[in-house]
């Protein structure tokens, strides 16, 4: 952790203005803060649940939810990194595990749902999930505070099929809401309707030019452009294989039709995190921890964010990227995913 004497909230407020006005034309001079970590002294604050954090979602009340793969929970934070609603009373959501999972839950991706679709039940009542989680054990679950403030509920369990979910996004097609989930083991993007029913046809999400041995990994929907990253699979098709030049990025519409190949290999290395910052696409590599920036339209490489010493920003085990109010928040599963960081770039 870089020592600071100025309160984090003050630093971030000033830095946000610089980020917004400068954008990536300021290729150097970026900085960051580790807001939370499970290791005392690594973050400004310590949260024992920040173990291999992946997905990041922004709520309607301007708080941030971070999914902790290693702890099987999601935690709510204020934008300055403090736990919400208070340090003494953090809001922690327990994620359910698949029936075939004999260990703990292992959530990865998350998306905020502001629609009236995607209902989940606590056994008595059914309400739209505000947060939708996907997990490596093939579980899709949803949370609504009016069902249970501290527990998500099962929506779909495909653990018995061998499904391994790494990412999730939502989209609208023909005035209906759909859920898109990257099944890394099966090597395709699954589509679910607004009632969590798997769509067998009609959403191909296919690219015949992706080499064998690669599978959909990360996914985000930016204004109807569904961006999917591809990573190399290991022999069991369970995890990614980090290696330089190993990765592809495609753009689909919400029907799952391929619009274009955006990026092929090059600087990619098991890419997962995605964000649009100042109109440019930021891509986070899990493989080498670096962030690469591309033209969001034609995929041309624009550079890598660097610090004041011209050193590329690099975060061991980099997972999620999420931009908000001039910041780019990130998560990382440091020390071979045994520990974690939730931080912010400015």
Q: Whereabouts are the PLM-identified features?
A:
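Residues at the start of alpha-helices and the adjacent loop-to-helix junctions
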Residues: 7-8, 19, 45
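Sequence/structural signature of beta-propeller domains
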Residues: 26-346
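Bacterial N-terminal signal peptides that target proteins for export
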Residues: 2-12
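Bacterial N-terminal signal peptides
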Residues: 11-22
